[in-house]
A protein has these predicted regions:
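A residue-level marker of the well-folded mature domains of exported/periplasmic proteins
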Residues: 20-348
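Bacterial N-terminal signal peptides that target proteins for export
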Residues: 1-10
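Bacterial N-terminal signal peptides
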Residues: 9-17
Length: 348
């Protein structure tokens, strides 16, 4: 009897540990599990999204399983299937391909799992909700900043990935601003290309070709994000045109912020990711808990339905307000952004 009693005493704590390992909360109920499927983690921006989103979910008592597809739509579909087999309650997706990701929504719904499109709209699907920044407004802010400073001349447009719906929305916003100037003949668009996977090396090639064809006569480059801006600026530097040609960007990445204060990049569009991550976490937990979704301020048609959309306003940033926005928010550190600038020139 003594031996049997001792065995029971040893087994009971072990069983308690097993219960904890399954992610039970203090009351013994299992935690809500969120699957977060990202297209890529190559860019600084997406690493920040991952970390902030996970932190926001954990703060609310949920756990997050993260997968990154390395810019591969087929791999992303496979990873989503894996997340579903692990029993996630809700799926949050940064889609590689806006159209083929419809399969992800269909597969998730067959398992009774709702889907949140994070930052990138998923087309032609019964998507549950979309949480993002206003991508059209991003493009408008980029073009607006440049045309106010160069209302005439040759313009180069470098878009993002052609299979990313956001890239097209940004381009729509750019053209909302540029078209009246083009129609009047003040601005001539001499190159209008897309950079595969938003890659800087693709932007470099596009910019090199544009400079060659136009004998370096370029007034401005409407680059759709900071990565493509960096590629374009590399091509400009090779022709000793750094700072002479206006260049836009998006994301307020560290390298871009350094280029802005140095005068190589004219502006960037800052998107407060902490607001996006918090809203996405709130929506995901609401859906995963089978609670009613709060009323969305607007809807967006994805080709199949009007999708409830929660869109956050971006912020136009240049060297004059960078410290009051990007640095004040803690997105970048003052000493990192200004590391190549004499300290007496740092903002006070």
């Amino acid at each position: 009897m003594k031996i049997r009693t001792r065995r029971v005493a040893l087994v009971l704590p072990f069983l308690a540990l097993l219960g904890c390992s399954k992610g039970a909360d203090k009351a013994g109920a299992p935690k809500l599990t969120i699957g977060f499927s990202l297209d890529t983690l190559k860019e600084e921006r997406w690493q920040r999204d991952r970390d902030l989103f996970v932190a926001e979910c954990e703060k609310r008592g949920a756990r997050v399983l993260v997968q990154s597809a390395n810019n591969d739509a087929t791999l992303q579909n496979s990873q989503v299937e894996n997340l579903l087999t692990q029993g996630v309650n809700v799926l949050v997706v940064v889609a590689n391909n806006a159209k083929t990701a419809a399969t992800i929504v269909e597969t998730a719904h067959k398992s009774g799992v709702p889907v949140v499109a994070y930052d990138r709209l998923i087309l032609d699907s019964d998507l549950d909700v979309y949480v993002s920044f206003d991508a059209v407004r991003v493009g408008e802010q980029q073009a607006d900043y440049l045309v106010k400073r160069r209302p005439s001349g040759n313009y180069v447009l470098i878009g993002g990935s052609p299979i990313d719906n956001n890239a097209h929305l940004v381009r729509d916003g750019q053209m909302n601003v540029l078209k009246p100037y083009v129609d009047k003949g003040d601005i001539k668009i001499v190159s209008e290309q897309w950079a595969k996977d938003w890659q800087p090396v693709e932007a470099l090639k596009i910019m090199e070709n544009a400079l060659t064809r136009n004998r370096n006569d370029v007034a401005a480059v409407v680059a759709s994000n900071d990565g493509t801006a960096g590629g374009a600026i590399q091509a400009l530097a090779e022709q000793k045109l750094t700072g002479k040609v206006l260049v836009s960007g998006q994301d307020a990445e560290l390298g871009a912020c350094q280029r802005v204060v140095a005068g190589a990049q004219t502006m960037t569009v800052y998107k407060p990711i902490h607001l996006l991550a918090a809203k996405a976490a709130e929506i995901a937990i609401t859906l995963g808990s089978k609670q009613p979704l709060p009323a969305a301020p607007r809807t967006l048609n994805n080709g199949k339905r009007e999708v409830p959309a929660f869109l956050i306003d971006p912020i136009q940033v240049d060297k004059d307000n960078l410290a009051a926005t990007v640095i004040k928010d803690g997105w970048q550190k003052l000493e990192d952004v200004y590391k190549d600038v004499p300290k007496e020139q740092w903002p006070q």
